[in-house]
């Protein structure tokens, strides 16, 4: 039995219409998986569920929708903010937390952040491919880069920001995580003393001690998402 690949398309999907997939997607289907015209693929757009389609025209990258096989549904997942880190490591982090079900990703600039921007086109492609691979129906949002001080102003008593720090004198505990709380991952150099003091002064921010082991930023992000899943899924 041939493997049936899943592909994301940005277009609206309905019954018995022609859709154009990307050259990359058609190459994977026909050159890697050796599919031919008439063979089946699966398509999703983040809002309309998952559809079984048939390859119609390989040269023009056209498929035809046949049947809705997974209805649209909400996919609960956490939100995370992360200081920008080395582009390769940032890409790995985004890929893994997307597979785990993150809903929103907020890139943040802190005092020790060495990188101020990210390659949006590349990151969005990584997100799409991670959703295709993990059988997600929804696509997480990668937001614009924001300064840490401005980011802290987004929170209220109804939503808290949890920050993992390397010091033991903290104001909270990750066990107190609520479903709509957000986690902030620090940069490769950690947070400055001024930033930690700023966290401790904010009522909407809780710091917690991640343990004796010093985690890489991408590891901390994955660990938090895994903890959220264990508690709420």
Label every model-predicted segment.
Residues 19-21, 75-79, 180-182, 202-210:
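Glycine/charged-rich beta-loop-alpha catalytic/anionic-binding loops adjacent to active sites
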Residues 71-160:
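RNA substrate-binding interface of SAM-dependent RNA methyltransferases
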Residues 155, 159-198, 204-208:
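Active-site/ligand-binding-proximal alpha/beta "capping" segment
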Residues 1-71:
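N-terminal positively charged helical leader segments and presequences
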Residues 193-233:
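Structured adenosyl-cofactor binding patch, chiefly the S-adenosyl-L-methionine
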Residues 12, 68-69, 110-113, 212:
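Short, ordered loop/turn segments at secondary-structure junctions
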